[in-house]
Amino acid sequence: MSEAAMQGRVALVTGAASGIGAAVVATLRAEGATVATLDQVASSGGAASAVADLRSPEAVGAAVAQLRQHVGSFDVLVHCAGICPSGSTLEHDDALWMDVYSVNVLGALRMLRAVVPDMRGRGGSIVLVSSINARFATPGLAAYAASKAALEEMARTAALELAGDNIRVNTIAPASVDTPMLQASFARAADPAAARQANVQRHPLGRLGTPQDAAELALFLASPRSGWITGAVFALDGGAGVTRR
């Protein structure tokens, strides 16, 4: 994709400190975008950065306002931030379920509320990172999966509601991407190497996804190249979704 595709555009990337978010930041910058970053820990790589807890509407609003002062109004939001606690459906108490929803669903909503006013009347692109688990059940991930399913439905509805302002909303649903979060899940297994290999074998293409795989798709959805796409969920799964149907 040519540099002109993102030249002059201002993007905000959440979850930017590592994994998919960090790859998105580097990719958008390489294609000419001005990128601001937001995470719950300090992140680098962008023209401006802020720290905020997505559980707090006030913190999110203040952080986005701070970033806007540095880079201007936002044309693009790529929302990668989220949490993924493990535990059975009945094991998690109400507080944990609500915490997952506060970060993974309401956190995304808070980001939309913060950036959509910038895009009204001039258009924009919003890319939300979901998960294959929104469609295919995995034992031990009930709260996470339910939150990602809710995120996808919220995105589809927002796509319809914002289409009149030419604000596009799309979702990426990755399978296993080799990020620090996934590596931590392998480390908790009795045999981490075996757990990793078993996970690889679930993907017909024979490997885990990389953060760069996700970043390239996010770049396409953020750019004018995808100008007639909204309300879509893109499977980024190495074929895993085909074998699990």
Indicate where each model-derived feature is located.
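Alpha-helical segment proximal to the catalytic Tyr-Lys
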Residues: 117, 160-164, 227
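Active-site loop immediately N-terminal to the catalytic Tyr-X3-Lys motif
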Residues: 90, 136-142, 164-165, 206, ...
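Active-site helix of classical SDR
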Residues: 112, 147, 155
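Short C-terminal tail/terminal secondary-structure segment
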Residues: 2, 136, 219, 230-245
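Substrate-binding pocket helix/loop in short-chain dehydrogenase/reductase
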Residues: 88-89, 93-98, 199
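Active-site loop-to-helix junction immediately N-terminal to the catalytic Tyr of the SDR YXXXK motif
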Residues: 92, 137-145, 157, 185
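Residue(s) in the substrate-gating loop at a strand-loop-helix junction
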Residues: 131
